[in-house]
Amino acid sequence: MSAVNTQRNSLRAGMIGMGMIFDETYRPMFQALHAEGLYRRDFGYVDVALTAVATRTGARARAYKKSADGRLADFTSFEGTDSVERAVAAGIDFVCVASPDDRHFDAAKQGLQAGRHVLIEKPSVLQLQQLDELVALARDKNLLAKVVYHKLCDPDHKKLRTLVEDGELLHVNNGYCSLLEPRSISKGQFAEWIAGRNPGTYVAVHYIKLIDFTFGGRLKTVACTGQRGIVGPADGNTW
């Protein structure tokens, strides 16, 4: 049996963006960590606190502060066009990026340049050249830079990997998936997030990651089809 580490440490988190992804994933996580902390016998107890957030207007941060009702320690809210720069400079240890996709690269780059570890919601960036730059920057500064795929925690995703790990699912020749959703989702709920996206970065990243998560990257080809005129003009990008 390994020895128990009784050391107590702390991590200060920064949050970029406080929209739907924050509400559904990060908010409950930070509230649970505030109540219970993080513990494992090999690294001991870690107090993880949300200490800085960055948003464009500050409205969501103010509303969350009001509704938190003691479930979270107080945090500093930065707003405006330079909110990310000020948040990553606020003495945090790591930053979580959950802003609209076309802002991921700048926020992640600022975090790494400031010496912060980075967690980025999928898709990490919208251009592979940007990903190369972030990877190089993280390696140069010896920092963690990871992409979050929240759907890997879905029961069906975990079940599929379990079938592979248990040797019940041995080989797959072909797989097929489709996305059917009302136009109101992309034109309304996700309207701000749609800028610069394509079918690959919008949702296919989930399925590609599921294959990687399940089969360990043994993927040969990916093909994607779409329709024009769904999100944009009929002669624009394919969706």
What is the predicted function of each stretch?
Residues M1-A114, A136-D140:
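N-terminal glycine-/serine-/threonine-rich beta1-alpha1-beta2 phosphate-ribose binding loop
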Residues G115-H117, E121-P123:
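Short helix/strand-capping hinge loops at secondary-structure junctions
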Residues S124-L144:
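Rossmann-fold NAD(P)-binding glycine/threonine-rich loop
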Residues R27, A61, L131, H157, ...:
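A general structural signal for well-ordered alpha-helical segments in protein cores
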Residues P123, K146-L152:
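Rossmann-like NAD(P)(H) cofactor-binding subdomain of soluble oxidoreductases
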Residues D101-D102, S124-V125, S178-E181:
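Short glycine-enriched loops at secondary-structure junctions
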Residues L119, L144-K146, Y176:
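Structural detector of well-ordered beta-strand residues that form the stable sheet scaffold
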Residues K151-A234:
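Predominantly a Rossmann-like dinucleotide-binding segment in NAD(P)-dependent oxidoreductases
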